[in-house]
């Protein structure tokens, strides 16, 4: 008769073997896993699993310097950090160029150690063409974060191949030196290595709202209430991608500005108004405010002209935390010298 302790030992070994095949974030180490399966609320465009980038073919490497790395603190979604890119270089076998000033890196750390990342870039190739990039990534912890890259390149160009295929990146961000490296691989033909661990599934703590991928859309019955904030935003010249896989794309970089009203402060350099000019034209402006007393607030203002909706993300312990839970509406941008002016309102029904 087998001793109970021996049975327990055998069961433990079997469980260890099983956990090598399918793990869960917070319960095991994701390093070396064939796939990281994202949480359904942050699918990264590859809901069935993100492969190891190094299993593919290197497409390019970007070396960037950072203008700032802002520790926002604990927001309604988790522990938030935002990095703003000052500029960078892009080198690869098929594409070379630069990373434009103002790219954004949003990093979210959840209570169980899970990491979620969103990045927004504009690249400029050596022959002067612009490429709009938006990436979503995740990892069980900071040791293995994988970014799924989505490119919008000009369809009538020799880099139109970026519009197809599957690309996964690996980023290394050093807040102390204010540098970031991004290596992007084509994993379209990548196969999991035989005998390696199969998948790690991302889990999330209960009761925490998921961060949104898209901007909020106003309900038909919403209307403008009390005036909240007026902002003036200074802008750089447009960076036009032109016709691409989702329609004509145009980017207008944000270089600064100021805000008055219920909140006083300034618009920080970085981010942009990311426009899709397919009818009906839409904008998705992403940028940062800094209040007069030093609080950093993440701002997003998106939608079609005539129905723009701003949303906010700020530290939950701050005196501006009411921004996290309210609903708001925005005016259309009005032309001002060197930029635009906007007014934000409380939303009523």
Task: Name the predicted role of every residue range.
Residues 1-11:
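Bacterial N-terminal signal peptides that target proteins for export
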Residues 9-19:
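Bacterial N-terminal signal peptides
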Residues 31-349:
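Beta-strand-enriched cores of mature, soluble protein domains
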């Amino acid at each position: 008769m087998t001793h109970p302790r021996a049975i327990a030992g055998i069961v433990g070994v079997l469980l260890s073997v099983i956990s090598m095949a399918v793990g869960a974030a917070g319960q095991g180490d994701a390093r070396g896993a064939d796939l990281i399966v994202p949480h359904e609320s942050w699918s990264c465009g590859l809901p069935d699993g993100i492969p190891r980038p190094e299993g593919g073919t290197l497409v390019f490497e970007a070396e960037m310097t950072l203008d700032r790395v802002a520790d926002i603190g604990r927001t309604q979604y988790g522990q938030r950090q935002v990095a703003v890119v000052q500029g960078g270089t892009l080198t690869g076998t098929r594409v070379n160029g630069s990373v434009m000033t103002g790219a954004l890196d949003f990093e979210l750390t959840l209570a169980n150690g899970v990491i979620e990342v969103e990045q927004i870039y504009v690249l400029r190739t050596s022959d002067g063409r612009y490429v709009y990039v938006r990436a979503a990534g995740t990892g069980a912890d900071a040791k293995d974060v994988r970014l799924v890259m989505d490119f919008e390149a000009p369809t009538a160009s020799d880099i139109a191949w970026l519009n197809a295929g599957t690309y996964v990146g690996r980023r290394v961000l050093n807040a102390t030196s204010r540098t970031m490296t991004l290596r992007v691989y084509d994993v379209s033909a990548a196969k999991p290595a035989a005998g390696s661990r199969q998948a790690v599934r991302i889990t999330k703590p209960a009761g925490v709202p998921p961060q949104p991928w898209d901007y909020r859309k106003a309900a038909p019955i919403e209307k403008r209430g009390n005036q909240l904030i007026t902002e003036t935003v200074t802008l750089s010249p447009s960076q036009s991608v032109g016709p691409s896989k989702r329609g004509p794309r145009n980017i207008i970089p944000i270089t600064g500005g100021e805000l008055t009203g219920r909140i006083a402060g300034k618009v920080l350099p970085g981010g942009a108004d990311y426009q899709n000019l397919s009818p009906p034209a839409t904008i998705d402006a992403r940028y940062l405010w800094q209040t007069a007393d030093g609080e950093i607030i993440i701002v997003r203002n998106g939608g079609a002209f005539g129905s723009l909706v701003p949303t906010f993300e700020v530290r939950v312990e701050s005196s501006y935390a009411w921004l996290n839970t309210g609903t708001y509406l925005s005016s259309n941008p009005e032309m001002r010298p060197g930029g635009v002016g906007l007014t934000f309102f409380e939303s009523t029904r």
